[in-house]
Amino acid sequence: MRVSRLLLVTLRDVPAEAEITSHQLLLRAGYIRRVGSGIYAYLPLMWRVLQKITAVVREEMNRAGAQETLLPQLHPAELWQKSGRWQGYTAGEGIMFHLEDRQGRELGLGPTHEEVITSLAGELLRSYRQLPVNLYQIQTKFRDEIRPRFGLMRGREFIMKDAYSFHASEADLRETYGAMDQAYRRIFERCGLDAVPVDADSGAIGGAASQEFMVTADAGEDLILISDDGQYAANLEKAVSIPSAASPLPDGPEESIPTPGLGSIESLCDTKCWDPSQVVKVLLFVATLDDETLQPLLVSLRGDQELNPTKVVNAVSRTLNKGVLDCRPITPDYTNRQQIDPIPFGSIGPDLSDDVLKGAKTWQPTFLRLADETASELGSFICGANQPDLHRFNTSWTAIEQKPTTLDLRNARAGDVCQHNLESRLTEKRGIEVGHIFQLGRKYSEAMESGFTNENGKTEPFWMGCYGIGVSRLAQAAVEQHHDDSGICWPTAIAPFEAIVVVANIQDDTQGQLGEALYAELQAADVDVLLDDRKERAGVKFKDADLIGIPWRIVVGRDASEGIVELVRRSSREVRKLPHAEAVSCLIKALHP
């Protein structure tokens, strides 16, 4: 390919819409162009990158025994209604684009394909003799993101590889799950990414176990916690730890203490010289359940800890055996709309009476009471007295009549002691999720009534796994991890071209002829090469070459008459002046050892 024929439009200025480096570089280097909010065109250079990533993914999936297929992007609503996910994915802040056809039938644009593939498996996989089966596809997905951002990191349309496996036993599922784990590690290594596998929450997909693969980068949206001994890593949503010990309160009787204007933990502790770990703070929420019930929550947490919203949602779902569509804080405005008496925000205790919910228009009449382990373990503590500007000092759980359900509801954080090794502590890193694997169990096969006949002639639901890789996100994550001040530094395996021959002055016959000869020789050696034959200044060509990030560059310049060229490695900026034949030999050896 010649640059003179390539659709390459580079930008010198940073586009205002781009917040993170990788997004800026992909726009500036002419890889992508924004069409709408969260919608991008993949231009020729980017399409080559995506094709190379796809080739690696396809090779490793095939090597692991998976079979490629292609599923429809339009999904009948009935399938999602049968699984129980239609309401959660389309109502409120649901992420599924949905529409009606001209007959009024509801359809959704697939953000994921569990329902479709499980329905098909129920029709096609009748006997245990056909199992296990692992099917994958690579195609465009759609998600109605509330706030698309960061380019391809969080878009409304994106390319994804998703695989679904079907098994006759849980043991067989675990075996395939392990094989997919190894395949993913090979994929990310081959793509030149430093990806960390971490324990993860299963989220809306569900299932018994899941693991994310995170590319570590300062611009990552996710916080991951990693033990300093390297034996544990988890997403913040899932991470567990041993918190620091609470400061004990002095012995003494319970007393009520006026606290006018001290409605926050910070102001309360600063004014009274209390330690936040001595306080039980109480947070109120309303959870919208999948049966449209609005369930008030009363959650107790030690004052020096942060609540983990994902753990709260999971706790509600497990406790009530219902899905949670939404969970939002109760505010004074919210209580006013319910037409109930004012709640003493800033002075709420864990024994707040259900009476405050009397007369609520749509809420359930009682709280679901939950407490984090850090709060429940306190022998004595400070808490709100359920009256404005009043707190109780040295109270205890024995004085609380309605005991909460105790669970892990807090955020683990850097510096916490690890549960697996008391000598190890957690550290924080930012990460970009590029892959996620799940053991789904029988969640979907039971809901979809999809199963097989076992060796005893009885019908039972499939054991299932699912395995996703964000192909387009992976491409941008690679840029986030591999760039410098001048532009992108693509890993060779996924670069749009392996090498670029830059002719400094194409109007110089000697330079032009040597450039053409090098280009032809590299093509003959099966090198994926680009020739910059434009009638541009040499400085422009060098800047563009740095910006687009081709791993190797051969510069044909003023020494062309002597047969000397420069061989430049983009990632290290190492420059070697060599006879052209030696430069070609060195390059081929580096690319195809």
Curated annotation (Swiss-Prot):
CDD domains reported for this sequence: ProRS-INS, ProRS_anticodon_short, ProRS_core_prok
GO annotations of cellular component type: cytosol
GO biological process entries: prolyl-tRNA aminoacylation
Question: Which Pfam families does UniProt cross-reference here?
Answer: HGTP_anticodon, tRNA-synt_2b
The Gene Ontology terms for molecular function here are: aminoacyl-tRNA deacylase activity; ATP binding; proline-tRNA ligase activity
**EC number from the UniProt entry:** 6.1.1.15
Tell what the record comments on domains.
Consists of three domains: the N-terminal catalytic domain, the editing domain and the C-terminal anticodon-binding domain.
Which protein is depicted? Answer: Proline--tRNA ligase
The record lists the organism as Synechococcus sp. (strain CC9605)
From the broadest rank down, the organism's phylogenetic lineage runs: Bacteria, Bacillati, Cyanobacteriota, Cyanophyceae, Synechococcales
Per UniProt, what is the name of the gene that codes for the protein in this document?
Answer: proS
